[in-house]
Amino acid sequence: MLKLFSAFRKNKIWDFNGGIHPPEMKTQSNGTPLRQVPLAQRFVIPLKQHIGAEGELCVSVGDKVLRGQPLTRGRGKMLPVHAPTSGTVTAIAPHSTAHPSALAELSVIIDADGEDCWIPRDGWDDYRSRSREELIERIHQFGVAGLGGAGFPTGVKLQGGGDKIETLIINAAECEPYITADDRLMQDCAAQVVEGIRILAHILQPREILIGIEDNKPQAISMLRAVLADSHDITLRVIPTKYPSGGAKQLTYILTGKQVPHGGRSSDIGVLMQNVGTAYAVKRAVIDGEPITERVVTLTGEAIARPGNVWARLGTPVRHLLNDAGFCPSADQMVIMGGPLMGFTLPWLDVPVVKITNCLLAPSANELGEPQEEQSCIRCSACADACPADLLPQQLYWFSKGQQHDKATTHNIADCIECGACAWVCPSNIPLVQYFRQEKAEIAAIRQEEKRAAEAKARFEARQARLEREKAARLERHKSAAVQPAAKDKDAIAAALARVKEKQAQATQPIVIKAGERPDNSAIIAAREARKAQARAKQAELQQTNDAATVADPRKTAVEAAIARAKARKLEQQQANAEPEEQVDPRKAAVEAAIARAKARKLEQQQANAEPEQQVDPRKAAVEAAIARAKARKLEQQQANAEPEEQVDPRKAAVEAAIARAKARKLEQQQANAEPEEQVDPRKAAVEAAIARAKARKLEQQQANAEPEEQIDPRKAAVAAAIARVQAKKAAQQKVVNED
């Protein structure tokens, strides 16, 4: 009982939702054996006959080629194409190809020489001793692609399967009306097809191998069973005729009961599917050493006198095949490449045969009926009932017309297999498949644009990151290459630092400055030299950084230099021609001189006779004495050279002169006799003394260079001097009396 249940489970057939049963129309072409077609005079071989990018050209115009010679190189997913016959390459130019849009694609045009010479062929009869990688590479380089209609490179598909394939399915359903290419191939070449299946099984090592074939092909079923009579590793499954049972997802579910997930592939559930024609091409590539240069094409339709299946060379113009079959076109004759449900109408008959061409249908006007006008959707849901992918064609139709791409994507328009079942049952004659094809093309274009935008953004961000890295590296180089202080500057800095440390260590020792001795300014000078060295190093580093960051403009530099020279000349001119705007008032000068002399005498007298109550700061005393002497000399000089406009009171002048002399003597006495109570900084003392000497020299210079503007009256001067002497003597006597 368990064995019976297992056998029933093993041979069980599942059924998918939807599907239709259109007229088969297969008897027109499946009754005659395969035949060869005479060679055409010219062949057009498009470089791209598969899903993916076109290969790289390896021939040039004027080259002689042999049948099977590669015309392109296959790298990665790029599949090569081969010469269908021997001849000469006459052109490499765009040419219309087998596509609904009939767009021109780059093609190699070969003029046949009629000899049909092959390249040297190297078959692998011992393919079982070859590695998996070697077999896949040979299949790929010999140009084998899916011949069921998709055109996916077989080598890439086998490589992607890897070790996760448990079930290998051979699609022999061929469910679309009129097409009998696979049926006739299995009838005439069943042994070769099975041998190709064994090569695929050797590569994939699946757990089971299934051949799915519809029950409307009794002769092909008989031939396969005869070949598989002694085989137990390959199982032939006969399934009911239903369109589109030949779809990859539909046949997978029929044979295994497994459903391919939305947006996924059959390999995701451990299943890999190949077409009958692909298995035959694999056998010829591996065992016979022949690249794919021809395939079986069905020529059918009431407009063809001799329908049947022929071996058509790739690149043969459609017109040549139809004429050989007795094509009798009507006034508005159409030719369909493919079947009536999934095929497309050719715009002209110069289109070449490619790897995915399985049928050329030339129906009469009565065969397909008059074209019906498209009407509005009545929402009958017949399309949803017929859809084998469980989609909602009515909703997808509205989304496609309204260009609502997001909603169309959400409703899984990508899962549409474009079988045409929905359009077949539509009572409003709406060409739903055309809308879906256009919508998928627009979505693909949008995604391609988004991909390019993302790549451009990634390139921009990478460029920004590279610029940031280069900037950081450049700044690091500038920092490391900055000019260091010269050797002598380093020595000066080190010496200054050593002296500073020594001074700090000796800070507790008192510093005594003796009168008349010159202070030691070596530490100050060394520190100043060190600061200058540091400034020079810093300036050099700044200059180098500025030079590295910005290159100076020579014109701007020249202009600035010219402006500087002009300013210098202007200043020299002003200094040479300038005259003092204000004159010194002689009366005020005489008064100030008299006052200064009086203050000096008074200070001298007080200093000579009095004992200081407080200690005097020698630094301040020296500075004040120098300032007083300078002022006295300046006033005397001004008084000698200037003529006062008004008379000066001689008594006041004598008093002021005496006071000035007294102050001066007092300051000198205090400086000579006083001992400082506090320690004096020698550096500050030296600086103050230098300032006082500089001011005194400046005043002497001004007094020596001054020119009197007016003459002084000698009589008045004599009177003033006499009065001053009298007053001075009187003051001295009075002072002596006071002391006694």
UniProtKB/Swiss-Prot annotation:
GO cellular component, one term: plasma membrane
GO molecular function list: 4 iron, 4 sulfur cluster binding; electron transfer activity; metal ion binding
Residues involved in [4Fe-4S] cluster 1 binding: 377, 380, 383, 426
GO process annotations (BP): electron transport chain
Highest taxon above the source species: Bacteria
Residues reported to bind [4Fe-4S] cluster 2: 387, 416, 419, 422
Function: Part of a membrane-bound complex that couples electron transfer with translocation of ions across the membrane. Required to maintain the reduced state of SoxR.
Entry protein name: Ion-translocating oxidoreductase complex subunit C
Lineage: Bacteria, Pseudomonadati, Pseudomonadota, Gammaproteobacteria, Enterobacterales
